[in-house]
Amino acid sequence: MLRVLLVTDTDKPIGDLRDALARLGYDMLAETATPEALHRIVQSERPDVIIIDTESPSRDTLEQLAVMNAAAPRPVLMFSADANQQLIRDAVGAGVTAYLVEGLATERLAPILEVALARFAQESQLRERLAQAENELAE
């Protein structure tokens, strides 16, 4: 069972989201992190997947994601109202696996999570192959 950490910087209630994820069979971590606490909570709780609900990801959030992704990469889904192309590129560069605009709809969660998990697994394999090739070249 995958462990999911929810991160939000909005005032929207997230009970429906938590319920939908639980119905899909995900283990919901007890704490809903704020972007500022992301790195600390990821280190202590070790979620398998992170879902971020934000109006617009802040520079601090993206920096925390980049640090987390460098230390212990994991799939990150970001739901945002901000469709700014540069912001989307920055989010992907920080480690966001899937960036979705137009808000978080619980009925779309299952396919979105499946795509994000598959893409993350593929990227992880590529990173491993790259590291192996670099090691072989160094020898």
Label for each model-derived stretch:
Residues R119-E139:
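CheY-like receiver
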Residues G25-T34, I41:
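Short hydrophobic/Thr-rich beta-strand motif most characteristic of the beta2 strand and flanking loop
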Residues I14, T34-H39, D48-M68, A83-N84:
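Conserved phosphotransfer microenvironments
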Residues Q86-L87, L104-L113:
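C-terminal output helix
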Residues M1-P13, L17-L21, I50:
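Conserved acidic segment of CheY-like receiver
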